[in-house]
Amino acid sequence: MGRANTIMTPLSPLRLTRDLLAFNTINPPGQEEDCARHLGRLLEAAGFSVAYHAFEPTRTSVIATIGGKQEKPPICFTGHIDIVPLGAAKWSKDPFAGETDGDRLYGRGSTDMKSGIAAFIFAALNLAPHLKNSPGLTLVLTASEELGCEGAKYLAGEKLLDRAGAIVVAEPTANLPYIGHKGLLWVEIETKGKTAHASMPEQGENALLKMNQIVSRIDNFDWKHHCGTDCHHVMGKPTMNIATFNSGLNTNSVPDAARVTVDMRTVPGIDHVHLCRSLETLIGPLGTMRKIIETPPLYSEPDEWIESVFDAAQAFTGQRPPPSTIMFSTDGADLQRGYGGGVPTVILGPGEPSLAHQTDEWCSVGKIEVSVEMFERVIREWNGI
């Protein structure tokens, strides 16, 4: 599907979210460029300096800045433009039309996370006239978060990120703040053997039996021994899950290849390079391993600014949960690294986490409107306006 036709009405958080839903940015293939440039034009018209950065053709991220003339660095808001595929189940609503039913706005990306982008961009447009001589505001709109945070990794790796004193990641949290998430590491392990007729297995070399030995070793992985820690005071324990297992083509042959994929969720203090080396040592000569996707853990100890974000959320939602971390991973970890590390980061957005990636995904219109006010307060307080 392409872009849906939209009725030209005065810009509002709802209309801006609908406009973004109309761009088909399913990843793969992503093709975020048209959506990125649409947002870039809106921000340029409001006085932002806008730069486009593509890690591949049509895979475009945006960095937009305003202010930033003072010693205090800008505050950064970030969100990803890409969305996940629709899935096999039939939708009852057009996933790109932005249909509403009462308080619900339907569409792929409505919760994850075009509503969050629309909310902080609308807040930025409202405040732009007051930000030109302030510490400033930076908006980072990324491509391909859903497949390994490729856009954020590119921006960080190419040193395209200047300064930020704080980061807000507008992923779906139902307008409740979180202070981090576990890291993500996916690997594929492969073993090789020699095929033979199943009636003469001694003439072959069974790759599946080799893999069984590896799986047994991984299943008994000692995080404390190999990585120096097996628990975080907020996130809890790291996890390792053997996710897929493929071997053999037919029952009457000795399998000459076997593959497994492993999902690991890591906590601060676990170095992914060291973790991979430990796994390779366990695998030894039995097989080989390659990394598929990696995102480092993200965690910020509560400080004065983070407490002020919790204050803002409480003022608009009436809730103040204890500082905790979210289950999914985000661009925040790579962007924090790109800004030099240690930048206090909060995950906060209007979407509902349980609806992300679901058939008939929707977001509360009321929560989008509340998040605009909440984001405006956070931006105002940072910039003293």
Each predicted region: which residue ranges?
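Hydrophobic residues within well-ordered alpha-helices
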Residues: 1-3, 43, 334-339
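Metal-dependent amide/peptide-bond hydrolase catalytic core
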Residues: 51, 179, 186-385
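Acidic-glycine-rich active-site phosphate/pyrophosphate-binding loop
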Residues: 86-101, 163-164, 179-190, 346
